[in-house]
């Protein structure tokens, strides 16, 4: 029997780790561990930021790594706050995120998740796995346990991410879609 491949997921967020482990739980040969690593905050487009963070993490840890970068993008603001949503959320909270759109009629937006994976071998490309979910920015509803989930309502649903069961959220969310793409990659590489 082959040994399990350990991949370091660079996060200090236990909720994110749990979500990733739940989604990839069927993989018998992959072990996802959490490594809280302080990486530089790169500026730029989501794909570029993800690649830079993953390459730096792989260099520091000398092995296979997985990083996740999430954006919340408002259509009225040309995609902002985008990859900078973390900083807005820390300063404003979910209520402030919603109030950012006070001056606009258009409250539509999308959540974008990018997982970047490096096998840890120098010279190999960083691979990206993306998921996107269209929705509306609404007044916060539901538990405040997971970032901006209380103010994002996916199209076709009457609940915010925060009000949904984890099973439903994982099946439709930007992160769930990105994890599905990642899972398919590991299946193709016979890592499960």
Curated annotation (Swiss-Prot):
Note on how the cofactor is bound: Binds 1 divalent metal cation per subunit; can use either Mg(2+) or Mn(2+).
Origin species: Ciona intestinalis (Transparent sea squirt)
Coiled coil: none
One Gene Ontology cellular component annotation held by this UniProt entry: cytoplasm
EC number, as in UniProt: 3.6.1.66
Reactions catalysed: ITP + H2O = IMP + diphosphate + H(+); dITP + H2O = dIMP + diphosphate + H(+); XTP + H2O = XMP + diphosphate + H(+)
Record protein name field: Inosine triphosphate pyrophosphatase
GO biological process assignments: deoxyribonucleoside triphosphate catabolic process; nucleoside triphosphate catabolic process; nucleotide metabolic process
Pfam family, one: Ham1p_like
Positions bound to ITP: 11-16, 53, 69-70, 86, 146-149, 169, 174-175
Alphabetical list of SUPFAM superfamilies matching this protein: ITPase-like
Task of the protein: Pyrophosphatase that hydrolyzes non-canonical purine nucleotides such as inosine triphosphate (ITP), deoxyinosine triphosphate (dITP) or xanthosine 5'-triphosphate (XTP) to their respective monophosphate derivatives. The enzyme does not distinguish between the deoxy- and ribose forms. Probably excludes non-canonical purines from RNA and DNA precursor pools, thus preventing their incorporation into RNA and DNA and avoiding chromosomal lesions.
Signal peptide location: none
Location within or outside the cell: Cytoplasm
Subunit organization: Homodimer.
Residues annotated to bind Mg(2+): 41
Xref: PANTHER family: INOSINE TRIPHOSPHATE PYROPHOSPHATASE (PTHR11067:SF9), INOSINE TRIPHOSPHATE PYROPHOSPHATASE/HAM1 PROTEIN (PTHR11067)
GO molecular function: dITP diphosphatase activity; ITP diphosphatase activity; metal ion binding; nucleoside triphosphate diphosphatase activity; nucleotide binding; XTP diphosphatase activity
InterPro entries xrefs: ITPase, ITPase-like_fam, RdgB/HAM1
Cofactor: Mg(2+); Mn(2+)
